[in-house]
Amino acid sequence: MSVKPTLSKPIGGQDASSPAVVMRRLWPYVKPLVWVLVAGVLAMAAVAATEAGIPALLKPLLDHGFGSKGDMTTKLYVPAAVVGLALARAIAQYASGYLLQYVSNRILLDLRIQMFERMIHTGVSFFQRETASTVINAVVFEVNQVLSVLMGVMITLVRDSLTVVFLLGYLFYLNWRLTLIVAILLPCIGWLVGKINRRLRRLNREHQTLTNQLAYIVEETVGGYKVVKVHNGESYEIGRFNELSRKLRGYSMRMTVSGGLAQPLTQFLASIALAVVLTIAVVQSSNDQTTVGGFVAFVTAMLLIISPLKHLMDVNQPLQRGMTAAELIFGLIDEPREPEGGGKPLARASGAIEFSHVSFSYGISRDGRQTLDDVSFTVAPGEMVALAGPSGSGKTTLVNLLPRFFDPSSGTVRVDGVALPEYSLHDLRNQIAMVSQDVVLFNDTIAANVAYGQTPERDGVEAALRAANLWETVTAMPDGIDTLVGDNGMRLSGGQRQRLAIARAIYKDAPILILDEATSALDSESERHVQAALETLMKGRTTLVIAHRLSTIERADRILVLEGGKIVESGSHRELLEQGGLYAHLHRIQFQQDAG
């Protein structure tokens, strides 16, 4: 299955993501720490300056310190200066490492927190569009690539660039003619880096896409392991995984080939320059234009400049990985938030619901049909309304409009006579409790799951568990309500997970309930107890019930039958059976299945 990571996109309103664009986006995070950063850069500058100090000490030692006639002062101060230089370098190196690590980790913390906050406040469409593996990859792993850029790349760019500048300055001081030969290298290297840089950027983006696809295959296989095993799908999944892994390896090798060209080509150009320098230096020495100390100092400085140049060449690959990671990170940060709604407060709703000419579509379909088409109905406070109809008729979409998971394409949804966008989104959702057929539990205690989003009160948790027919089961557990339920409640049975989700809705005590196939996972005995608890709970509360099993909704005050996104029938269970329409047809089919 091909999954394109739609989070990855150019950032900052530019045609392409570049280091300059990324730095502009990072500036708000860097600004509060700018003086710490400046101190770190100054410490790096001190480290870079010590590189030029090494050949600078060699020249007087060779010119004035060697031999029986050598200057004693030079013989003494040069070794002492070497020790002092090494000590200063060590202190500056430690200071720069600590200060830059402080800055980068603080930025990493701020980025990761902002990414998670933005993710959790995005609309439902974001979670439908993106795979979990892509989002996890961006929040947990890709942000570390930016840390790599902030640390490794920044240290390399600043420290080694300054080292090159200091060494070039010293070379000009020693012999400007020879230095011009070295300087010719730099434009050649810059052109070479630019060519390799563009190719690496493209390869890194494609590599990131394949990495997300590989993570998605693992996510699917782990999540659907039962289906994989019962259908003997191991060979198919292994084949998918191996094929994509080989493609990923191919891209990695292409990146290695492209990135690895920079260093040997740089060394080759440097060797040509060294050969020319040696030739000219020999000619100058014959004319007494240079000394042995000056020549050795020049060659030493020139050789010392090669190492930081290599580092600057090697910075391409991590830099391009960082740019690709930045696209994911800022792509997530730039995701639009859910609308916060109006400023109208809603302490506790009476529960009156109105759908007025509501239409909704997830996108443009080939036949132009909408998921919901001009739906209108009202629900009185405390009324229980059931939604029935064949699969795909729009039942779940309809109830998803109530907590504003989506907004209608046209028409208005009202609670207590007020359009939903006028309410604060937080206040609106406080009025709604939902139990879905896809039970979601968190890897926490039973009490924390029951009171999710609120402060757990043991008496309230116990009452909710009793109402959901789960209290005796919980008290039999070693840690009671403090028992950890595991990943999505894997330590509980299917029926226990369903009842725990119902207990969560009971604990919330919201005036509006949405029950989406709420008892479908229960055995007959548990369903009987839970149904009784739900009937008690629903008294005085507005309830919307979705069920594929019609027996669940027979006792509803009113049943709305949907087909093709429209309400085609409305009435009580008995009235709809007497009409002999779609509801009666569905009831007859299910009755025959149950009898069979």
From Swiss-Prot:
Query: Which intervals hold domain ABC transmembrane type-1?
Result: 38-321
Q: Which family does it belong to?
A: Belongs to the ABC transporter superfamily. Lipid exporter (TC 3.A.1.106) family.
User: Where can this protein be found?
Assistant: Cell inner membrane
Broad class of where this protein is predominantly found:
membrane
User: Membrane topology for this entry?
Assistant: Multi-pass membrane protein
Q: What is the official name of this protein in its record? A: ATP-dependent lipid A-core flippase
Organism equals Burkholderia thailandensis (strain ATCC 700388 / DSM 13276 / CCUG 48851 / CIP 106301 / E264)
What Pfam families does its record include? ABC_membrane, ABC_tran
The protein's matches in PROSITE patterns, at most eight in alphabetical order, are given as:
ABC_TM1F, ABC_TRANSPORTER_1, ABC_TRANSPORTER_2, MSBA
Question: Per the record, what are the reactions this protein catalyses?
Answer: ATP + H2O + lipid A-core oligosaccharideSide 1 = ADP + phosphate + lipid A-core oligosaccharideSide 2
Database matches in CDD domains = ABC_6TM_MsbA_like
Task: Tell me which EC number(s) this protein carries.
Answer: 7.5.2.6
Q: Which residues form the ABC transporter domain?
A: 353-589
Q: Which GO terms describe its cellular component?
A: plasma membrane
Q: Which UniProt keywords apply?
A: ATP-binding, Cell inner membrane, Cell membrane, Lipid transport, Membrane, Nucleotide-binding, Translocase, Transmembrane, Transmembrane helix, Transport
